[in-house]
Amino acid sequence: MKAIRVGLLGLGTVGSGVVKIIQDHQDKLMHQVGCPVTIKKVLVKDLEKKREVDLPKEVLTTEVYDVIDDPDVDVVIEVIGGVEQTKQYLVDALRSKKHVVTANKDLMAVYGSELLAEAKENGCDIYFEASVAGGIPILRTLEEGLSSDRITKMMGIVNGTTNFILTKMIKEKSPYEEVLKEAQDLGFAEADPTSDVEGLDAARKMAILARLGFSMNVDLEDVKVKGISQITDEDISFSKRLGYTMKLIGIAQRDGSKIEVSVQPTLLPDHHPLSAVHNEFNAVYVYGEAVGETMFYGPGAGSMPTATSVVSDLVAVMKNMRLGVTGNSFVGPQYEKNMKSPSDIYAQQFLRIHVKDEVGSFSKITSVFSERGVSFEKILQLPIKGHDELAEIVIVTHHTSEADFSDILQNLNDLEVVQEVKSTYRVEGNGWS
């Protein structure tokens, strides 16, 4: 029976994992799709480098188009990263009638819609399960398992680096900079951690999730982003005192025809399932009108978890090839994109304020909120050590719009009794959904 022949772009951590799974699981793959899988060509940087996997020398090449233009290659698997140049490689592969599997979240967040259209036009499949949450099969779940439902909300911990940092800050009461260095030493954070800690990595993944979950062409620029680098020990301490856990949460929510997508530090009730996701693990919480609340949990990165998702996509492509139904791996968007304005986005808010500790300060602050019709769910007022003339007020509001909350912050900063608004965070998950 004719083998399916794979061309692999990249033989790093994930690429080596892909080769290992294909080599070690031949019997399983044969049983799944009824034909063997062979690795025909592999792009590498250095032909002489010692590798963790055993491949014949004639399979290796340093020229990308040796893989893409090889007439014997049926499926191109891309694990080299990059955006602009890599996009062209995949477009050329699709135009050469080769199916594509990619783990590239950066590429799919920016050019996903274009690549899906290119695949359909050429009668080819493109799969990208590994681009979001590594070993968690969340994209296929949205596209297939929950395809009959209407998804109204997704909340995700989709960046392992920031979850590791926040877990350590909470459990060990360690400052941000100290935990970041530990994460770098352990290999969880890059030497330049900006993409992770400022929320950009998570934003790319949320754009992909929202695109599939809401069937709209959601782009990276549609995602509002705030990272974790400004979170302080005091923020962590006060949130715990009020019964919340700080997480970097990607939020995608639909109300009627409008959606919002954001990534930001968020306070969740301690009893919320996402609050129990620790260290480098990922999880995605999904709410559907029919299914209700579901959550998907697992490793968000790493060689073998990510490679497992890549090879699972390869199996999906192979099955489609055997059945003659390629070119329809993903359905196009059903709806026109319609993003919420700040006046449409409602949430509870947490804020810490340093104020003058004098008669009338609190009433002046509460009047700012009451003018906007915003009430309080929780309030703390405490002295500030070493500053007898000041007090700290911590407030959790009831639901208010982003537009009203922005005006409230401006009016608070204009008050003579307010020394500084120290921090603000969104609060989610009271009642879970």
Curated annotation (Swiss-Prot):
UniProt cross-references to Gene3D superfamilies, sorted A to Z: 3.30.70.260, Dihydrodipicolinate Reductase, domain 2, NAD(P)-binding Rossmann-like Domain
Annotated NADPH binding sites: T13, V14, K45, K105, G302
SUPFAM superfamilies: ACT-like, Glyceraldehyde-3-phosphate dehydrogenase-like, C-terminal domain, NAD(P)-binding Rossmann-fold domains
CDD domains linked to this entry: ACT_HSDH-Hom
Function of the molecule: Catalyzes the conversion of L-aspartate-beta-semialdehyde (L-Asa) to L-homoserine (L-Hse), the third step in the biosynthesis of threonine and methionine from aspartate. Utilizes NADPH but not NADH as coenzyme.
Family classification: Belongs to the homoserine dehydrogenase family.
Name of this chain's protein: Homoserine dehydrogenase
Gene: hom
